[in-house]
């Protein structure tokens, strides 16, 4: 026969929520840092293609 599970305490719930929010804030900070480096053209850790539309106009 199925028995009901015990209720999760408020402290455990708040600890899990705080850990989740901490991880989300760290990811947001990293994304903002990458965006800033792309805008200032100082990004060296990854490759992103140049705009192809400009090259097509020059060839015609």
Swiss-Prot record:
Instruction: Using the UniProt annotation, give all residue ranges assigned to the region (Disordered).
Output: 1-22
Q: Name one GO cellular component term.
A: large ribosomal subunit
Database matches in InterPro entries: Ribosomal_bL32 (IPR002677), Ribosomal_bL32_plant/cyanobact (IPR044958), Ribosomal_zn-bd (IPR011332)
Assigned keywords, A-Z: Ribonucleoprotein, Ribosomal protein
Gene Ontology MF annotations: structural constituent of ribosome
Pfam families per the record?
A: Ribosomal_L32p
Annotated coiled-coil positions are none
Its domain of life reads Bacteria
Composition bias, Basic residues: 1-20
The alphabetized list of GO BP terms reads: translation
Which family does the similarity line name? Belongs to the bacterial ribosomal protein bL32 family.
- Identification of the protein by name: Large ribosomal subunit protein bL32
């Amino acid at each position: 026969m199925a028995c009901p599970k015990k209720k999760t305490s408020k402290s455990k719930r708040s600890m899990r929520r705080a850990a989740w929010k901490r991880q989300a804030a760290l990811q947001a900070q990293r994304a903002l840092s990458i965006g800033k480096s792309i805008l200032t053209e100082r990004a060296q850790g990854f490759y992103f293609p140049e705009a192809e539309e400009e090259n097509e106009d020059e060839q015609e």
